[in-house]
């Protein structure tokens, strides 16, 4: 099997992946700020790094996968105050909702899922180290800030020059800062902060800045120098740039070897975002589409490419997934283990080892499906199911997928009992030689999105189309 090559944002190139410890991978991914339901952009991040950790394990690595939860920040505080509830009540509720969405999409839980509020002492410890090393200072307003210009390598991840950055572009100008580009490590508490929004520290009551949370959790749980850090493309700057400055400023060593960033989700060629009002929650999508269809829609686009969201693309994903499940219908896969020397498995592995090239890997699945359709071979069916399983796909019994309604509760879809009753009425019409009535029922079902297939021996199978 070829070596795994990963596009490293830091190097701006594909590199052969070499873990710090042979056979072990330590990976941190920036998770979700829990004050609302997860949207399609979150779904992409969740699925992408689920695929990454699945593939790393599939090729033999022992993986420690950490994905954090941000459960304290300004948006969370504002939402809790607006709702008249405690911060913990709000965040617990949306953490539960996030887990429900993850389960629907077939996301395997990370090995460790730390909440920011569980690591306040470690964050303060890192801030004190930065202060001792000359990178942090307490401003006149009580905030503790990071002095960006004192970190010589600032901008190495994003390629941005300090001299080219304008204050106010990503951070608001603040007279208390020594430099407008400095960012906050510890925010002094406000008089009207609700309960649970601040902690005691040597700098006074306050709460951590967003960036220090991930630095402290990553270094605490994975060590001060680890293998992979991932997240959405929008986090590359300033969040991940600031993580590097904090972590390396505190420890004096390289923070992360490989940086992975998934691309944006777009609607009509614009980035999907709350500010543009063009975003959809995972739950809204799952009201109309099966969760595995949504997962397939995400998986079939390369993780670094833009993902174009539309009903047309989701409908196409449903049709494509239906083709794969149809190939497995009426074929019982054999029970042998996956053999990486098999030609289809080799092509699949070569694609995944080429920076997780899922479009090519999925093309291999369709090649296999075509051969299964032609040969009805149990070994090929097993390979199709096993390889798709590495992507979190084709895990259901084919008829269960083919006979379900399109969404979680698609309005107007015939129930299974209604379909079976019509099939029974059609069979009765055929026995009575009323073929016109039998044809009418078949056409009626097809208009309702149900295709029939008469089998030898007189039985009839059906699937939704």
Curated annotation (Swiss-Prot):
Co-factor note (free text): Binds 1 zinc ion per subunit.
Annotated GO CC locations: cytosol
Biological classification of the source: Bacteria, Pseudomonadati, Pseudomonadota, Betaproteobacteria, Burkholderiales
Subcellular localization: Cytoplasm
GO BP term, pick one: cysteinyl-tRNA aminoacylation
Entry keyword Hydrolase: no
GO MF entries: ATP binding; cysteine-tRNA ligase activity; zinc ion binding
Protein known as: Cysteine--tRNA ligase
Binding locations of ATP: 274
NCBIfam families xrefs: cysS
Keyword check for Protein biosynthesis: yes
